[in-house]
């Protein structure tokens, strides 16, 4: 079971929008928007790591089941694009359309 959330830009894990999907687990440079979103967990934005290790899409898609939990009206449009729009690395979550067993739980709160 793979448990996921989705970022405001469609990223899952730390797989940020890109020009291609990365299959393997890898080191990434975090986008400023991700650093800013995670700064609430630190005393200042300067303390937020600038890089992270993330599962790649091959690792995520290899899960038998995927559960994605999405909270907030602000993520509704990117979620709808991921679920019903084109499959594109610009919205990394869109690749989940190809997985045979994905459950999405969405709340507007």
Q: What are these model-predicted stretches?
A:
Residues 1-109:
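Conserved phosphate- and dinucleotide-binding cores of soluble alpha/beta proteins
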